[in-house]
């Protein structure tokens, strides 16, 4: 039994890491890292703004795990493309508002860095929302069932 577990572990690891190499996987990983850096900057200057980074980092990590483990196909009652689209759209809007407020206040250096990184996060989340917009995704059409020569 231990041999079968050892043999299946690399296959499972490969299946889980394959998502990390896709465009969506790279975007989610970048969102997690950027939210962590913004969280550190906000914690050093104004802890009141850090809740946005914490929430978005947790949500991005949840979506990363859901897509990485292919749970979105196993939980069909949630519309994952629309959920992901609204998550990224709301994050982009909230990061834009928060960054503008932080940059207008003109605090210490870590606060300014957090504001600039928040604007970068706005662009990243906005691009992710554009990429995941469900209407943009190609729809599959049914293959013709009639023979090429016509019905017989």
UniProtKB/Swiss-Prot annotation:
Pfam family, one: MARVEL
Tissue expr: Enriched in colonic mucosa. The expression of A4 follows a gradient along the crypto-villus axis with the most abundant message occurring in the lower half of the crypt.
GO terms under cellular component: endoplasmic reticulum; endoplasmic reticulum membrane; membrane; plasma membrane
Domain MARVEL: 19-137
Ribosomal protein as UniProt keyword: no
InterPro entries listed in its UniProt record: Marvel, MARVEL-CKLF_proteins
Topology in the lipid bilayer: Multi-pass membrane protein
UniProt GO MF annotations: chemokine binding; monoatomic ion transmembrane transporter activity
Subcellular location as annotated: Membrane
Gene Ontology biological-process entries: chemotaxis; cytokine-mediated signaling pathway; monoatomic ion transport
UniProt keywords, alphabetically: Glycoprotein, Membrane, Transmembrane, Transmembrane helix
Stated role: May play a role in cell differentiation in the intestinal epithelium.
Name of protein: Proteolipid protein 2
Species per Swiss-Prot/TrEMBL record: Homo sapiens
């Amino acid at each position: 039994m231990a041999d079968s577990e050892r043999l299946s572990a690399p296959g499972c690891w490969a299946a889980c890491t394959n998502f990390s190499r896709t465009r969506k996987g790279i975007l989610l990983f970048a969102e997690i890292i950027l939210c962590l850096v913004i969280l550190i900057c906000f914690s050093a200057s104004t802890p009141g703004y850090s809740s946005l980074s914490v929430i978005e980092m947790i949500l991005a990590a949840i979506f990363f795990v859901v897509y990485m483990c292919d749970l979105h196909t196993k939980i069909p009652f949630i519309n994952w493309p629309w959920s992901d689209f609204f998550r990224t759209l709301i994050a982009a809007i909230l990061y834009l508002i928060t960054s503008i407020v932080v940059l207008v206040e003109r605090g210490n250096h870590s606060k300014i860095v957090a504001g600039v990184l928040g604007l970068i996060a706005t662009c990243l989340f906005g691009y992710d929302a554009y990429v995941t917009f469900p209407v943009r995704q190609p729809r599959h059409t049914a293959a013709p069932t009639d023979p090429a020569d016509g019905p017989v």
